[in-house]
Regions:
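Short loop/helix-cap segments at secondary-structure boundaries that form the rim of catalytic
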Residues: 50-56, 69-73, 114
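Conserved beta-strand positions in the Rossmann-like core of class I SAM-dependent methyltransferases
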Residues: 40, 59, 105
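Flexible, polar/low-complexity N-terminal or interdomain linker segments that lie immediately upstream
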Residues: 1-40, 45-49, 123
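Glycine-rich, highly charged phosphate/nucleotide-binding loops
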Residues: 59-67
Length: 123
């Protein structure tokens, strides 16, 4: 039993290290925007939802346009987000973009988390 607990602990450590390397939160992104850091923010929700409100400076790239990679940049980090914590579109987009050689992270909690944190919304 002890060996499997240690194995699980090692797997958990690796999982969370990987998660931290490839995810970021809305507050961190807000600070990056405020400081003028060079990041590309990619909204993978439907275009109609992007028009209702989005992260300031974000580019709309709904699923039907992922193959175009329009708006993605090779010279900086691309941060993708979708609707909410239980939405997997952001992770799916991130996998596809990473497979094409783009540096990419996912925003934890999606746009819902952005709103819950009371951050600025662009329209």
């Amino acid at each position: 039993m002890t060996k499997s607990i240690k194995s699980n602990a090692a797997k958990a450590k690796q999982f969370f290290a990987d998660k931290m390397a490839f995810t970021t939160g809305p507050v961190e992104i807000s600070h990056q925007i405020e400081k003028g850091e060079d990041v590309a923010i990619i909204d993978v929700r439907e275009a109609k939802d992007f028009k209702k409100g989005h992260v300031p400076g974000a580019i709309s790239l709904p699923q039907e346009k992922w193959s175009t990679m329009a708006g993605l940049r090779r010279d900086t980090m691309n941060i993708v987000y979708c609707y909410a914590q239980n939405c997997h579109m952001g992770a799916n987009a991130a996998m596809q973009f990473a497979a094409k050689g783009y540096s990419v992270m996912e925003m934890d909690g999606g746009f819902e988390s952005w709103k819950e944190n009371g951050l600025k919304i662009a329209k």
